[in-house]
Regions:
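Generic hydrophobic, helix-prone segments enriched in Leu/Val/Ile
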Residues: 10-13, 75, 91, 120, ...
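Short, solvent-exposed secondary-structure capping/transition elements
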Residues: 48, 90-102
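Short E/K-rich amphipathic alpha-helical oligomerization segments
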Residues: 56, 98-110
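Elongated alpha-helical scaffolds
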Residues: 75-95
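Amphipathic alpha-helical coiled-coil segments with heptad-repeat character
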Residues: 81, 88, 110, 114-117, ...
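Polybasic, proline/glycine-rich intrinsically disordered low-complexity segments
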Residues: 115-149
Length: 149
């Protein structure tokens, strides 16, 4: 599976238009490539795979799922898994920017420029929960103990 396939899936999920305006294509691809490595390093993600290799030279992901269904279903699962992970990484980067943490000193009290930090944190937490549920459901449904009916 190519990185481009994963990036395309991410683009369909990303709703923040500033991401596409903020970075050139090369900058965005470099950033997303780093995020892919971060996602693979997450223990509950890594545990889904028997083998997984990110080849940055040819921009390709090679993998074998532990609970494989068939090639097409596995590809859909992996694309969605990494696209969701990229969305989380992107949101984390937005939350950690200096603008969202900035305060303005005015008159007698501090005021925040935009007080949506807490809402963004809650949204990020929801995305992470959905991410874990997505993995959990895949592993549970395709686990050998349930068997086929």
């Amino acid at each position: 599976m190519t990185y481009e396939e994963i990036y395309s899936q991410f683009y369909s999920k990303e709703t923040d238009p500033t991401f596409f305006k903020k970075y050139s294509k090369d900058e965005a691809y470099e950033l997303m490539k780093d995020w892919l490595h971060s996602i693979v390093a997450i223990p509950f993600v890594r545990k889904c795979f028997s083998t997984i290799t990110l080849d940055d030279e040819i921009l390709e992901l090679k993998f074998q799922l532990k609970n494989s269904v068939d090639e097409e279903s596995d590809n859909y699962f992996v694309k969605n898994l990494f696209a969701h992970g990229l969305k989380i990484c992107c949101m984390q980067k937005q939350i950690d920017t200096s603008v969202s943490l900035a305060t303005v000193i005015g008159a007698k009290e501090e005021k925040t420029i935009l007080n949506n930090y807490k809402n963004n944190e809650l949204r990020l937490e929801q995305l992470e929960i959905q991410f874990r549920k997505f993995i959990r459901d895949h592993v549970y449904i395709n686990n050998d103990y349930i068997g086929e009916e």
